[in-house]
Amino acid sequence: MFRRLLIATLIGILAALAVAAFRHAMQLLEWIFLSNDTGSLVNAAEGLSPWRRLITPALGGLAAGLLLWGWQKMNQQRPHAPTDYMEALQTDGQFDVGASLVKSLASLLVVVSGSAIGREGAMILLAALAASSFARRFTPREEWKLWIASGAAAGMAGAYHAPLAGSLFIAEILFGTLMLASLGPVVVSAVVALLTTHVLNGSDSLLYTVHLTVDLYAREYVMIVSTGLVAGLWGPLLMWLMTASHNSFLRLKLSPPWQLALGGLIVGLLSLLTPTVWGNGYSVVQSFLLSPPLFSLIGGIFACKILAVLASSGSGAPGGVFTPTLFVGLSIGMFLGRIWGFWLPGSDEIAILLGLAGMATLLAATTHAPIMSTLMICEMTGEYQLLPGLLIACVVASVLSRTLRHDSIYRQHAAEH
């Protein structure tokens, strides 16, 4: 057991280093190509001329597509191992190292160029790949899946500062159940990854800064649970829209480079309306939580952002769908909060409260993992007083969503990509 805990610690450190390497590579490329050192792609887009804002996502998509297409052509004849940590866990615990690195590099290109896709997909993949490489060299074959799972959880902890949610992500989504025998090393890896990330970043700050002073009474719980009901309907709709977008791109019968370029061009066109469509939505989520926008502005940004997410995901851009889902959930929750605010005092507080509820419940509705979704929002924001209400709302959203659509967003995304 102590041997496993030691290995889990080492994997946590490796995973944090992998996440940090991807993050620093992003910052370097943003500085080189976009002259941006703020870490915010929205700020980068605002500083570009309209024509550069238009073509940059298209060029990034084209470059990523050429990279993936070229690698595929070069390796047509050799057998393929998984390039996805979920698939690796469901098979024999092995990765195609070269293809996984190429996929991560392609993800880096589309993320840096502004596509509305999450960076966490590549971060978790690299963390799991680092864990797999270590495990194959130093551990018996029957343990490989455990260490890949530990690496994936540690990658999520490093990316989102949420070790408990990262561990439950593995337990609820990948293992399908809370397996206590396997959860110990997974939790250790996740916590060590978070601590290592804090050391590398020089701070232990939360991922999102929130100033919420509202007291929770029966009225607030009713609003939170009602947000869960709405998210339970929106989750299947969002997944259906992603599938429809993916099928629409396939019907065009374009080669991968041109398909990804078209997706990037759509994002570029939308960014002419509002630069907030660039990137995974992290900086916009933070600005909304600090200063909730007006009703009409939420609706306009939401419409443009969801079209950008559909274009990026549907075109096959390699990356995650986790953070974009958080943005969509925040917008839905704040939209509902503004509606409640027509009749109730403290409209900004209500908007922030239901924005957080929207993030948690739409995440639960799309992942079918209510416990993970609840803890994720609490760990990212530090608002643990919301836990009871969010847990009820997330269960409601997950049950309703699963009733309407059996597959989660991760199973759907894996099947399409």
From Swiss-Prot:
Organism of provenance: Salmonella typhi
GO cellular component: chloride channel complex; plasma membrane
TM regions (residue ranges): 5-25, 54-74, 146-166, 173-195, 222-242, 258-278, 288-308, 316-336, 339-359, 380-400
Keyword tags: Cell inner membrane, Cell membrane, Chloride, Chloride channel, Ion channel, Ion transport, Membrane, Transmembrane, Transmembrane helix, Transport, Voltage-gated channel
Subcellular location: Cell inner membrane
Family the UniProt entry places it in: Belongs to the chloride channel (TC 2.A.49) family. ClcB subfamily.
Molecular function (Gene Ontology), one example: voltage-gated chloride channel activity
Keyword Ion transport among UniProt keywords: yes
Cytoplasmic side: 1-4, 75-145, 196-221, 279-287, 337-338, 401-417
Name the UniProt record assigns to this protein: Voltage-gated ClC-type chloride channel ClcB
Membrane topology qualifier: Multi-pass membrane protein
Topological domain spans for side Periplasmic: 26-53, 167-172, 243-257, 309-315, 360-379
Single biological process term from Gene Ontology: response to acidic pH
Chief location: membrane
This protein's record includes keyword Cell membrane: yes
Pfam families: Voltage_CLC
